[in-house]
């Protein structure tokens, strides 16, 4: 079930360095929210705080709240691994497990989280590959290495792997940056379908992509190199691209900087 994200007063650190400062926003369920902004503005760091991947980096920590419906993901006793089951992630470069088959890539998370009969795994693998619009392309090569697929197919395999464990939220960190235009279009079409089931947040440097796929867009910026990134504004995507409230947003979108 897709869930709502409410972030309030969030600061993220690497050691003593404040990477992002005082971020507050709401991400509605069954929607696509895009994060845009210049390199180094903290949008990917913020994305990673939404499933506690930020903590994997030595010295990574946050203060503030990230609520998934009524649950504080940083509350006492909350297991970060359990958080990452609820809030899945797709990374910038396709990263299928290189020694695993297509089938085993999709089934990996299920096997890690519990015991399943072969028939149950078969059903979930097919459902997930269909959900990622990949089934018809790989159904006859399920036992072949996932690394043998094309780049676009590998990224859809990673999406299938992420949705197999039925998360509530799907985070995507520049999922098309390493792909050709045809593969990018396939991923964008897939995002439009997946938002019917999941809450989706995507980081992208491609503003045309943000305009095409998202319902809401958040613009991040920083005052100078070495300063923390901040959320400048978030609004309906059409409004952000046609009539933003902040001059810096308009300057970035129009190409005056960034």
Swiss-Prot record:
GO terms for cellular component: plasma membrane. SMART domains: AAA. Pfam families: ABC_tran (PF00005). It is a peripheral membrane protein. The keyword Iron does not apply. GO terms for molecular function: ATP binding; ATP hydrolysis activity; ATPase-coupled phosphate ion transmembrane transporter activity. It catalyses: phosphate(out) + ATP + H2O = ADP + 2 phosphate(in) + H(+). One of its GO terms (biological process) is phosphate ion transmembrane transport. Residues 5-247 form the ABC transporter domain. Its EC number is 7.3.2.1. Its main location: membrane. ATP binds at residues 37-44. Keywords: ATP-binding, Cell membrane, Membrane, Nucleotide-binding, Phosphate transport, Translocase, Transport. CDD domains: ABC_PstB_phosphate_transporter. It is found in: Cell membrane. Part of the ABC transporter complex PstSACB involved in phosphate import. Responsible for energy coupling to the transport system. The complex is composed of two ATP-binding proteins (PstB), two transmembrane proteins (PstC and PstA) and a solute-binding protein (PstS). Belongs to the ABC transporter superfamily. Phosphate importer (TC 3.A.1.7) family. PANTHER family: ABC TRANSPORTER I FAMILY MEMBER 17. This is Phosphate import ATP-binding protein PstB. It comes from Streptomyces coelicolor (strain ATCC BAA-471 / A3(2) / M145).
């Amino acid at each position: 079930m897709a869930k709502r994200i409410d972030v309030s007063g969030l600061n993220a650190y690497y050691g003593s360095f404040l990477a992002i400062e005082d971020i507050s926003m709401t991400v509605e369920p069954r929607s696509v929210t895009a994060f845009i902004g210049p390199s180094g503005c903290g949008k990917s760091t913020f994305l990673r705080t939404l499933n506690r991947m930020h903590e994997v980096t030595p010295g990574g920590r946050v203060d503030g709240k990230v609520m998934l419906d009524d649950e504080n993901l940083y509350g006492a006793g909350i297991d970060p691994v359990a958080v990452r089951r609820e809030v899945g992630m797709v990374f910038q470069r396709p990263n299928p497990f290189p020694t695993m088959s297509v089938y085993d890539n999709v089934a990996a998370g299920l096997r890690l989280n519990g015991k399943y009969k072969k028939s149950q795994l078969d059903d979930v693998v097919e459902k997930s590959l269909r959900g990622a619009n990949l089934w018809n392309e790989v159904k006859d090569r399920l036992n072949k290495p996932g690394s043998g697929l094309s780049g676009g197919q590998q990224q859809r395999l990673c999406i299938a792997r992420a949705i197999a464990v039925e998360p509530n939220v799907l985070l995507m960190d520049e999922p098309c940056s390493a792909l050709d235009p045809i593969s990018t279009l396939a991923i964008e079409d897939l995002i439009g379908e997946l938002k019917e089931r999941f809450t989706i947040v995507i980081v992208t440097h491609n503003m045309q992509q943000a305009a095409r796929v998202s319902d809401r867009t958040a613009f991040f910026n920083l005052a100078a190199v070495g300063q923390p990134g901040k959320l400048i504004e978030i609004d309906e995507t059409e409004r952000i691209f046609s009539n933003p409230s902040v001059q810096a947003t308009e300057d970035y979108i129009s190409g005056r900087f960034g």
